[in-house]
């Protein structure tokens, strides 16, 4: 097989002479390929052996020899591009082809199932890179899903019914309201080969104590081999579910010394990270996984180069021309909303907040959206689609002196950009300027910016009465926007006495949180793929999916 370097040199030669038979000299060719006379001879011989060209040399220095092209540079470039695509070397592919639109089409044509060297490979298209996969950090919806494929927790949650399942722990019990015990499986290994120890678990869980959700944990220790005790300062009936959350995934205790751990993490889950860069995330089935080995050997998540903002944010693993089979769609349990920052001077003007909520009513936003967005969005009147807690405010005129409003959202979210432009238009019609501020997800998560309003979103999972409160309570931004004492609410929630519907209604009626839209989650792919059940994050469990062989 020819080397990539030889292929590139032939393409340069072919492009220089535009594929035409020509009389030339070795000296001229050294200038074309920028190499010595001796090296140009070996290159021409190698290209001739590959059958790409014919070199009819004439004896004598300065004599002109004939160069004839048998193969075209375009054909070889296409072959090289196919090789790079098969090897998932997307960045090199962009450099070779040059045209990013052509690269997009090539990627789209190679989505879905691939069978290479006896391995089942799934290729998925996504609209942005997945750079941070570190549990207990600021993770977006898709990063949370991928982290669950890489890491394990003491417990796990059944995505279809919200019931608890064993994971690293095979059993657990509440010895007393403030004392829980978990019994661990033996012989569990991390992706880098080391066996899991009790110190890995105590270190992983102890690092969570500064977080609001875990602040009631007083101590984590191992009184005997394969046993973990957790002692609390206040009772928590949700603790086994809390330990199944992405925050509580177990890391190797030396994780901080491992290079670029957030982007190339090491866990004990069914898949291990092979590559993670701006154009691709590749994960491979972990043969030493303590559970059932994944049926798909490798999952490649490709990111299209410089994808336009109107690209749908659904998960896609088929090409655009394959009848657009939609495996599943569902209304998300959650949605987009606005948070009014209590640190802003605007928060001291309740009449201005009421007027803004009136302008930004869901139906008005939806009526200004394009057809595609209208199909994907639905008006929200609470945080969950099943509830109707928001009632339109009494129409009023624009408050005096309201001329400028700042809205903040995080990067790489196409729908925030679309919505913000609609909101800017609506305010401009009233003579008010909307200033848009885009920041990193980490800064958004922490609320690290001066802003009047923030875009927010929520993607709950089962059981909803657990995840709805947990996902809001864990978000530092929410603490900057809500006037309520969430710590008091957390005590009720942990004791299962917080009525979630009433709590949510109170939140919305306070005016600090304003529901906007619910989103239809979509999963598009091949019907030959079995075991696919879309979860409430819009993805599916990779380890349970498999490909049915073609019918004979």
UniProtKB/Swiss-Prot annotation:
InterPro entries: SBP_5, SBP_5_dom, SgrR_HTH_N, Tscrpt_reg_SgrR. GO terms for molecular function: DNA binding; peptide transmembrane transporter activity. It comes from the Bacteria. GO terms for biological process: negative regulation of DNA-templated transcription; peptide transport; positive regulation of DNA-templated transcription. The keyword Transcription applies. Keywords: Activator, DNA-binding, Repressor, Transcription, Transcription regulation. Residues 163-493 are annotated as: Solute-binding. CDD domains: PBP2_SgrR_like. Activates the small RNA gene sgrS under glucose-phosphate stress conditions as well as yfdZ. Represses its own transcription under both stress and non-stress conditions. Might act as a sensor of the intracellular accumulation of phosphoglucose by binding these molecules in its C-terminal solute-binding domain. HAMAP family: HTH_type_SgrR. This is HTH-type transcriptional regulator SgrR. The gene is sgrR.
